[in-house]
Amino acid sequence: MAFVSMKELLEDAKREQYAIGQFNINGLQWTKAILQAAQKEQSPVIAAASDRLVDYLGGFKTIAAMVGALIEDMAITVPVVLHLDHGSSAERCRQAIDAGFSSVMIDGSHQPIDENIAMTKEVTDYAAKHGVSVEAEVGTVGGMEDGLVGGVRYADITECERIVKETNIDALAAALGSVHGKYQGEPNLGFKEMEAISRMTDIPLVLHGASGIPQDQIKKAITLGHAKININTECMVAWTDETRRMFQENSDLYEPRGYLTPGIEAVEETVRSKMREFGSAGKAAKQQVG
């Protein structure tokens, strides 16, 4: 089964007011858990490799081959997007596309808007030739993303309008108060700004740093145009908690399958729960493949 672009998936999600989850992969077993959760929930899914973890995971070609083989061997029939998360340059995005990724995010959010737009346009021009969807970011999401620490900088509505019109991206991550990693205190999303940006750009929005955001805020973000929601920290915490518990209760355990399996099962349950929360469960039949 070939990977699919997220363009049509997100357009349907935005129109029907649900969201598709992006879940970051951290290895083969982790990927299996995400795919199995999607199949059980009959939900489309976005499996993402963060640029900063690509080499750790074996490189773009290895990742694409691994995920593709798992889809085939596990008889996965739901739509699967293979996405590059936080692509650091146009060249990295090209490498991902050439390796078979069906979607990329170019993250020029730490650059001045003119440079961000130029970098993004370079990616969208190349991606369009290969049927690959493109996500871009304006403003900066706070917290830590795979070692990159930053503060929150709200997206400027004029900059959002410019990048959408000048680059023809398929989805926009507009930073509006979310953070990567664990929240210190109650999350406080900028719903007023969110509504204005959604109305002005009229394309699917992406919520980064969604782990730990209360369900009522998630649902409100979906009604205001967010069709893609990124989850990573909650999965990592679920895995770590279960793995730590296994060692605490079984100090003599040394077989990897014995101590890794409970954590992977916790990841699967977390993903399934998020798919139900986002409203994507049962939506795979609309674009069934296989």
Swiss-Prot record:
Superkingdom as given in the UniProt entry: Bacteria
Entry-annotated residues carrying Phosphothreonine: 233
EC number(s) stated in the UniProt entry for this protein: 4.1.2.29
EC class name: lyase
Protein keywords: Lyase, Metal-binding, Phosphoprotein, Zinc
Residues that, per the record, bind dihydroxyacetone phosphate: 181, 209-211, 230-233
CDD domains: TBP_aldolase_IIB
UniProt: Zn(2+) binding residues: 86, 180, 208
Active-site residues, record numbering mapped to chain: 85
A Pfam family: F_bP_aldolase
Segments crossing the lipid bilayer: none
Cofactor: Zn(2+)
Catalytic activity, reaction form: 6-phospho-5-dehydro-2-deoxy-D-gluconate = 3-oxopropanoate + dihydroxyacetone phosphate
Keyword Repeat assigned: no
GO biological process: fructose 1,6-bisphosphate metabolic process; glycolytic process
A single MF term (Gene Ontology): zinc ion binding
Family of this protein: Belongs to the class II fructose-bisphosphate aldolase family. IolJ subfamily.
PANTHER family: D-TAGATOSE-1,6-BISPHOSPHATE ALDOLASE, D-TAGATOSE-1,6-BISPHOSPHATE ALDOLASE SUBUNIT GATY-RELATED
Function field: Produces dihydroxyacetone phosphate (DHAP or glycerone phosphate) and malonic semialdehyde (MSA or 3-oxopropanoate) from 6-phospho-5-dehydro-2-deoxy-D-gluconate (DKGP).
NCBIfam families: cbbA, fruc_bis_ald
Name used for this protein in its record: 6-phospho-5-dehydro-2-deoxy-D-gluconate aldolase
